[in-house]
């Protein structure tokens, strides 16, 4: 594949380049907001054309966060590049909420949670001072920012890919901690292929905790 198109609100797969340098050129009819992952860097800007290179064996992804169609051209065929995360792998599947009882049995969920927020791709056990969040295999939460709170994350299991501010961290070990300040990008991706390997994180916050506080910059799970 030498070319692909991204509608507004859509992203490419997160891929790993092969042994050759890859040149990428993005074009659109007028200036538009674009986000790219180039290995460990997350960058966004408003542009009509954007050309960049991906080093051998490095990771890359393109997200259309603007309002115009993006046309992406590659100088090499990317068909054989390893897909680490496909945001739309379950796009046409049944969206069934996660059963909290399944998680409570498998993982030693501490007593004392006061609420549960279950979605089809993640589930959150809400405690008075922290949350425990589980993310299904091959799924990710939205790339988002908060306007009223900052968050601290601790990885509990699953070796996720973590976006924090403008950096991307791959296959993160248990016990690693991140601080996500207000209005800074953050997200978590579960790259595991096994259907039983959930990613789990502990989330704490400072400021005002309100689900309406979330601004989802890229939300692949809200399929249009």
Map each language-model feature to its residues:
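Glycine- and acidic-residue-biased ligand/ion/polar-headgroup-sensing regions
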Residues: 11-48, 137, 147-166
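A generic structured-segment signal
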Residues: 128-135, 140-146, 151-155, 176
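A short beta-to-alpha transition loop/helix N-cap that caps and shapes the active-site region
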Residues: 208-214
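Short acidic-glycine-tyrosine-enriched beta hairpin
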Residues: 36-61, 164-186
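Non-cytosolic beta-sheet module surface loops
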Residues: 26-28, 64, 145-147, 190-192
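A short, N-terminal "cap"/entry segment at the start of jelly-roll beta-barrel domains
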Residues: 1-19, 54-131, 142-143, 214-224
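Short, surface-exposed secondary-structure boundary micro-motifs
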Residues: 63-65, 181-184, 189-191, 206
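Structural motif
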Residues: 69, 159-161, 185
């Amino acid at each position: 594949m030498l070319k692909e198109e991204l509608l507004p609100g859509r992203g490419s797969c997160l891929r790993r380049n092969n042994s050759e340098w890859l040149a990428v050129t993005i074009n659109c009819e007028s200036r538009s907001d674009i986000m790219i992952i180039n290995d460990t860097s997350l960058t966004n800007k408003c542009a009509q054309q954007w050309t960049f290179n991906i080093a051998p064996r490095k990771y890359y992804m393109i997200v259309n966060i603007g309002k115009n169609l993006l046309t992406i051209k590659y100088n090499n065929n990317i068909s054989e590049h390893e897909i680490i995360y496909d945001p739309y792998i379950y796009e046409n599947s049944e969206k069934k909420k996660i059963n909290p009882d399944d998680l409570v049995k498998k993982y030693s969920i501490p007593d004392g949670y006061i609420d549960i927020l279950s979605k089809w791709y993640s589930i959150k056990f809400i405690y008075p001072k922290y949350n425990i969040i589980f993310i299904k295999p091959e799924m990710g939460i939205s790339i988002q920012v908060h306007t009223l709170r900052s968050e601290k994350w601790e990885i509990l299991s699953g070796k996720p890919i973590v976006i924090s501010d403008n950096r991307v961290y791959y296959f993160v070990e248990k016990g690693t901690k991140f601080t996500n300040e207000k209005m800074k990008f953050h997200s978590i991706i579960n790259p595991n292929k096994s259907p039983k390997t959930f990613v789990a994180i502990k989330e704490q916050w400072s400021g005002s905790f309100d689900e309406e506080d979330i601004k989802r910059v890229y939300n692949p799970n809200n399929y249009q």
